[in-house]
């Protein structure tokens, strides 16, 4: 019987020198102490303790794959972006789907999922950094507080008290809370969930006309979700359930696909609609701004190296291309800086030179040097203006002017539009009886051992949304329906600026 042999790969140090012995450390005699001149041992240990890079503050654990984006409908009347220049056009992309608050724990544990896409367009990388929910919170000033509330406390364990204390003090969170506590709260896999850009972005066309836009990505596999009990069983057996499902589906040739839709609002409509169109706690009614199918994408190639491509992938809403822009959405405005800056901390200032993040088009930035620099600047002049015609700006790609007004101040966004209950009420009333009961039961399970005054505070928000929401939640939590208003007298939050 003959045995096929793989080609021998000789072990070397990082400088290319051969490793003579990878079994025994260099010592003074058989039983003597180690010698500091054991170069391979020194290098091996030094590299080992630096293998782990800083964890993402959110979306720490995820899966990723490369894929193909294909345009299915002409939207050039809305945008000049070349990725949408013609029907049938294909663009290479990378997607990372992730848990949000669960650190690097089990995939089936936390509820919200991250949905980040990177498109390698001929005009630069375009990133859509969203979630599997269409809404979030209105101001990034509270994002660090959210992070601390939903993750480990100072005592090193997650706390239902911290989580729900924070949520219940922010009535604007009820829309998101209603979604994540619903029967769609825990996706069965990354393949079986929708994705949303969530924010309001802008498009502009060759004529300089601006439109406001929301991006939607609907799973062609359909929606599948887990109950709390089903998720608990999966967690006990397989902490990588979502990662395994996505990877193995692609390996089998069952490429997951999503259809991309947009909602388009003419620029002037933003001042006319009866809600704040840039408020991330709100959705746009589809009867007013229907979904328009634009494209589809599939994830069809697994990374060869998980760390190189998935862990080092870096997404930022500031990665925009001509024809696609931002909006006055406060959360988006702050993320334009914060996300890229988080990648500089996590991966270094030259994170865009890592292959998975590198644009496929030529890059002619005169930013130079810094830790991890891997490309050369061959031009003699690294400054602008200069006498050699280098680094010339491109005014033809300027975004149309945006009219703004108002005095600079710490404006209370609640004074602009404090209706945080109409939309969760509409969502609640779309649910059938079984879905409403799942919402009540999931909320009760998630609130756990949180103090009663926090539970009552949340129930008051539910009552303000819909009496049936409050009554069902009260019953699931074992609270007396008549008590929520009376409990205000013992709620310590009443002294915190009238938040309730």
Swiss-Prot record:
Name one cellular component (GO) term. Answer: cytoplasm
Indicate whether Oxidoreductase appears among the record's keywords: yes
What's the family? Belongs to the catalase family.
What's the catalysed reaction?
A: 2 H2O2 = O2 + 2 H2O
Question: What does this gene product do?
Answer: Decomposes hydrogen peroxide into water and oxygen; serves to protect cells from the toxic effects of hydrogen peroxide.
What is the organism of origin for this protein? Neisseria gonorrhoeae
Name the positions where heme binds. 339
Q: Name one GO biological process term.
A: response to hydrogen peroxide
Q: What GO MF terms are annotated?
A: catalase activity; heme binding; metal ion binding
The record ties this protein, via InterPro entries, to:
Catalase, Catalase_3, Catalase_AS, Catalase_clade1/3, Catalase_core, Catalase_haem_BS, Catalase_immune_responsive, Catalase_sf
Q: Name the cofactor(s).
A: heme
- Record-listed E.C. numbers: 1.11.1.6
Q: Is this entry keyworded Metal-binding?
A: yes
Could you tell me the keywords of this UniProt record?
Heme, Hydrogen peroxide, Iron, Metal-binding, Oxidoreductase, Peroxidase
Name listed for the protein in its UniProt record: Catalase
What are the positions of the active site?
59, 131
């Amino acid at each position: 019987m003959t045995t096929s042999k793989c080609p021998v790969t000789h072990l070397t140090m990082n400088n290319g020198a051969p490793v003579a012995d990878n079994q025994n450390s260099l010592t003074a005699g058989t039983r003597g102490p180690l010698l500091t001149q054991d170069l391979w041992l020194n290098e091996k240990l030094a590299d080992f303790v630096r293998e782990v890079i800083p964890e993402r503050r959110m979306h720490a654990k995820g899966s990723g794959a490369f894929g193909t984006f294909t345009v299915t409908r002409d939207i050039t009347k809305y945008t000049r972006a070349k990725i949408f220049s013609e029907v049938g056009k294909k663009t290479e992309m990378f997607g990372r789907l992730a848990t949000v608050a669960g650190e690097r724990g089990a995939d089936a544990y936390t509820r919200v999922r991250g949905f980040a896409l990177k498109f390698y367009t001929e005009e630069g990388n375009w990133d859509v950094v969203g979630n599997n929910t269409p809404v979030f919170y209105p101001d990034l000033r509270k994002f660090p507080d959210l992070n601390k509330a939903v993750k480990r406390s100072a005592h090193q364990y997650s706390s239902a008290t911290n989580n729900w204390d924070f949520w219940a003090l922010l009535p604007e969170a009820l829309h998101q809370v209603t979604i994540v506590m619903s029967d769609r709260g825990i996706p069965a896999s990354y393949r079986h969930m929708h994705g949303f850009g969530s924010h309001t972005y802008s498009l502009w066309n060759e004529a300089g006309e601006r439109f406001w836009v929301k991006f939607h990505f609907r799973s062609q596999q359909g929606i599948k979700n887990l109950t709390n009990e089903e998720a608990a069983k999966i967690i006990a057996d397989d902490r990588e359930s979502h990662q395994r499902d996505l990877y193995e589906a692609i390996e089998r040739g069952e490429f997951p696909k999503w259809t991309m839709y947009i909602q388009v609002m003419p620029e002037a409509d933003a001042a006319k609609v009866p809600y704040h169109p840039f408020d991330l706690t709100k959705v746009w009614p589809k009867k007013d701004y229907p979904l328009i199918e634009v494209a589809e994408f599939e994830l069809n190639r697994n990374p060869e190296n998980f760390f190189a491509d998935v862990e080092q992938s870096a997404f930022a809403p500031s990665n925009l291309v001509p024809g696609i822009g931002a909006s006055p959405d406060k959360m988006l405005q702050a993320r334009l800086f914060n996300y890229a800056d988080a990648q500089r901390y996590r991966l270094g200032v030259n994170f865009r030179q890592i292959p998975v993040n590198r644009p496929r088009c030529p890059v002619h930035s005169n930013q130079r040097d810094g830790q991890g620099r891997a490309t050369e600047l061959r031009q003699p002049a690294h400054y602008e203006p200069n006498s050699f015609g280098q680094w010339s700006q491109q005014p033809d790609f300027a975004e149309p002017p945006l009219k703004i007004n108002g005095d600079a101040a710490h404006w209370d966004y609640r004074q602009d539009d404090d209706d945080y209950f109409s939309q969760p009420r509409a969502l609640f009333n779309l649910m059938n009886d079984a879905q409403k009961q799942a919402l009540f039961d999931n909320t009760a399970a998630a609130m756990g051992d949180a103090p009663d005054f926090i539970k009552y505070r949340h129930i008051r928000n539910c009552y303000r949304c819909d009496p049936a929401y409050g009554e069902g939640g009260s019953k699931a939590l074992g609270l007396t329906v008549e008590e929520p208003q009376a409990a205000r007298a013992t709620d310590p939050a009443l002294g915190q600026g009238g938040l309730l």
